[in-house]
Amino acid sequence: MSSKSNPPSAVHAKSQLSSRLRYNPDSAQLMLRLSTLEMPVFLDSSHDQSNCGRFDILSANPIAHIKIESGRLRVSDPEIEISGIDFFNGIRLLKQKYLPEPDPQIEWETELPFQGGILGYLGYPSLHGKNAIEIRDAFVGVYLWAVIVDHLKQSSHLVFHPQCPTAEKTRMQNWLSADEDFQAALAPANFSLRSPFTKELSRADYNQAFKQIAEFIAAGDCYQVNLTQQFRADCSGSPLAAYLLLRESTRAPFSAYINWGNGALLSLSPERFLKLTGTAVLTQPIKGTRPRGDSIEADERLAAELCASEKDRAENLMIVDLLRNDLGRVCKTGSIKATALFDLQSFSNVHHMVSSVSGELADDRDALDLLSSCFPGGSVTGAPKLRAMTIIEQLEAKARRAYCGTVFYLSANGNMDSNITIRTLLWQQDQLFCWAGGGIVSDSDCDAEYEECFHKISNIISVLQEQEREQEQEQEKE
């Protein structure tokens, strides 16, 4: 692992901390190229030019990292003591050692979201005691350079943290500025399924779990519980090839691909968790879903049905109130506002109902305080959060692992953005895991909730299984 360089002795100009690269509207080629390096991370807007999907962030070769897989912890730096119970403090220790406070006079590229810093993901936690959580699946790394692709301004930038060694800066500038055509040389490796996806929860078990949640709600124990189920398939080949295949059919503004060597996360998430810009906080929970229609008329009818649904509005408002409460722990009193309620956002296979809540971070708090205060996101737990999480642990047969956690960046300039890892797969030991779920409330219908799980995951599963069928047909022709 590279050693920490000395702090900068003079103010860095923008020209020293970033350089221009040739713009390509499709970041797939950059992903392929950087995938040859260690532990690549791609935060992928899928070329969505909306305010929430303008930038792609790509990096690799972290100077230090932490990973946990099913509770097994590995830290690249033995001097950093960390546990799953105190994981956020471990991230803080990593940040303090490898990302010391920069010179306040540094001229950052203020428009670019990431200036070097922390990139990674946190899986859905388990409960530890009455009020604490334990992170059992995660990967976070310290990345001192990144490629930022701005699809709105059609520009690409190679950015560096002030601690990035000069030799590494020169190497990356030369390598990424080369004019060679890498498209043919870096064609992705093949990916194929070796078995169809199978659900790990029988219909009878789902019905029983639904019934128990309904009883908890009727007794006043909780108002909403997010019930999920796991799907699994055997596979072979490159997880990046699978991700690139999926992103062609499932465009989502908070997509991500992370590979930590013996595992990879493939996320096609449409949902923002938390964003911090300066002291401005934004969270945008999704609650309420309808499938896309087979015709324009059917699609418009389903979208209108979602917008008019009192049930979906009530569920959405429950989560808005939960997030207002979470933000209240770290934001200035009186600053928290619901700036938009029940907006319609449409994606390739579903319509979603989305709300927006904003606040101003308190003077004595930072991005890690914000993340730890609100994690996991209320849209994937239920309300009240701790009681819903207790019920989830009691009823769900399989751990959620990467699902319902967050992929995030924490930039050296203090800014942060993150997703909720829905529509997300975990690749490990030639197996693919994915999950789907929904919020159960007092008037939920068991059949409808069960079907909604499949609406949410159907596009992902069908794309990968169709790829397998096409490969089999090609082999038969040969």
Question: What role is predicted for each listed range?
Answer:
Residues 1-478:
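Extended alpha-helical targeting/anchoring segments
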